[in-house]
C-alpha cells in the first residue's frame, strides 16, 4: 500500500486535481503475489490545466454507463492472446480497458500521454479510438515491441523523427 500512496503523492504534486480513483478488478483472477494474490489494480484519474475536465460518460446519457470499478480480464497465460502479450511484456494491460478509459475522458484527436509505454497497449487503444498518443519507454527492447505492435495494428511502417512538432497529427 505504501507504493500506491507514493504514486498518489507524486501524482498530486504534478497534476491539478485528482478526479477519481478507479479499481480495475481482474475478472479472471489474481496476478502475482505471495500470501494473497491481488485481483485488482488502482487507477488514478488526474486532471491537468484549468479547462473543465472531459466527461464523455455523462451519467450514461450517451450509453456509457460507467463506475469507478472496472471489470476486465487480466492478462494471463490462459488464453492465446494473453500469452502473446505476456511474451512481449510481463505487465501488459488489456487494450479494452485503456480504450474505454480514453473514450471516457478524451475526445477524438486529443493527445494521450503514457510515461510507462511497456508493451504499447495505450498506443493501440489510442489508435483504435482516434486519439494521438505520446509514449515514453526507457527500454529500447520495449520500444521495439511498441513499434512492432503499432505496425501490426495499422499496417503502416513507423518512421523515426528527431522532434514531433506541436501541430503534428502523427501517432
Where do the language-model regions lie?
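Short, structured secondary-structure boundary patches
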Residues: 38-44, 153-160
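Core catalytic lobe of class I
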Residues: 1-143
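Short alpha-helix adjacent to the SAM-binding motif of class I
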Residues: 141-152, 156
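Short, intrinsically disordered/low-complexity patches at protein termini
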Residues: 42, 146, 167-168
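SAM-dependent methyltransferase catalytic region
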Residues: 151, 157-171
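Short linear sequence elements within intrinsically disordered, low-complexity coil regions
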Residues: 75-77, 147, 165
Amino acid at each position: 500500500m505504501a507504493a500506491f500512496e507514493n504514486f498518489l503523492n507524486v501524482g498530486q504534486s504534478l497534476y491539478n486535481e485528482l478526479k477519481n480513483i478507479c479499481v480495475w478488478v481482474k475478472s479472471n483472477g489474481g496476478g502475482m503475489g505471495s500470501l494473497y494474490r491481488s485481483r485488482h489494480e488502482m487507477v488514478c484519474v488526474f486532471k491537468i490545466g484549468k479547462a473543465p475536465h472531459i466527461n464523455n460518460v455523462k451519467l450514461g446519457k450517451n450509453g456509457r454507463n460507467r463506475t469507478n470499478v472496472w471489470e476486465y480480464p487480466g492478462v494471463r497465460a490462459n488464453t492465446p492472446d494473453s500469452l502473446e502479450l505476456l511474451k512481449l511484456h510481463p505487465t501488459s494491460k488489456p487494450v479494452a480497458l485503456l480504450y474505454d478509459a480514453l473514450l471516457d475522458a478524451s475526445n477524438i484527436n486529443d493527445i494521450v500521454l503514457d510515461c510507462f509505454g511497456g508493451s504499447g497497449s495505450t498506443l493501440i487503444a489510442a489508435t483504435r479510438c482516434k486519439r494521438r498518443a505520446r509514449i515514453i519507454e526507457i527500454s529500447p527492447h520495449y520500444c521495439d515491441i511498441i513499434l512492432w505492435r503499432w505496425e501490426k495494428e495499422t499496417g503502416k511502417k513507423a518512421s523515426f523523427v528527431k522532434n514531433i512538432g506541436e501541430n503534428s497529427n502523427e501517432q
